[in-house]
Each structure stands twice: as C-alpha cells, then as structure tokens.
C-alpha cells in the first residue's frame, strides 16, 4: 500500500489530483474558517503532508486514508505542536522510534515550511 491513487473515490471530484484537493481545503480555510474568528490558530497538517510528498520520503499513508504510524504521524504532530505553541520546531532534536535521520530532516522541513506558509505547498530540498 502507499499513497492514494488517482482513482481513489475521495479524490474523484478533484480529478484524482491531491494538489487540487489541497488547494480547495486551503481556500475554505482562508475564506470561511479563519474569517469566522472561532479558532485561535491554523495547524496546516495537510500542507505539511503535501510538502513531504515533494521530497524523497516515499509513502506517507498506510492504507490510502491514514498516515504511517511513524513518520506520517510525526509530521502531523510536529505541525500541530508548532502551530499551537508558536515554538520553533527546527530546534527539536527528538524523533520517535522508527524515524531515521533522513525522515527526521524531511519531517522537520515539511512541518516548518507548512507553519511558515500554511496555504502553499513548499517543494522539499531533501
């Protein structure tokens, strides 16, 4: 298993294109969620995952719906933590068991870039 396929039923209305789906989510966040004033912050986990998909990381989902239990969840957690606390996640040195040095670097890069530009995918340098 691995990343969602173009014929995945949830992506059908977006032509099987994850980036189109991401753009629609970002648009809704900017036009509906944030202007509502009901939320303190945005945790752009979807953007972080899309950022990671531009890297050499490989699959980030385990069954087309759920993030991998190691690096996928770590990216989401880093993004949530950084967005919620405002702390600089590039200073984090810890990674869960099963996340190697390369995955760690990609996770930090992907999450930090998502926090910096939450509505735009940032191509990885890794």
Predicted regions and their residues:
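Catalytic His-Asp segment of secreted/periplasmic serine-dependent ester chemistry enzymes
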Residues: 5-115
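Long, charge-rich low-complexity segments
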Residues: 112-126
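Cell wall/extracellular polymer interaction/catalysis modules
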Residues: 1-2
């Amino acid at each position: 298993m691995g990343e969602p396929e173009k014929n995945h039923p949830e992506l059908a209305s977006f032509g099987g294109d994850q980036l189109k789906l991401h753009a629609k989510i970002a648009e809704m966040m900017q036009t509906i969620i944030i202007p509502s004033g009901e939320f303190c912050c945005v945790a752009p986990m979807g953007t972080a995952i899309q950022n990671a998909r531009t890297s050499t990381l490989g699959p980030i989902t385990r069954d087309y719906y759920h993030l991998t239990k190691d690096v996928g969840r770590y990216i989401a957690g880093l993004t949530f933590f950084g967005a919620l606390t405002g702390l600089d996640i590039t200073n984090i040195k810890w990674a869960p068991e099963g996340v190697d040095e390369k995955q760690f670097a990609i996770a930090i890069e992907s999450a930090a870039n998502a926090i910096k530009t939450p509505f735009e995918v940032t191509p990885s340098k890794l």
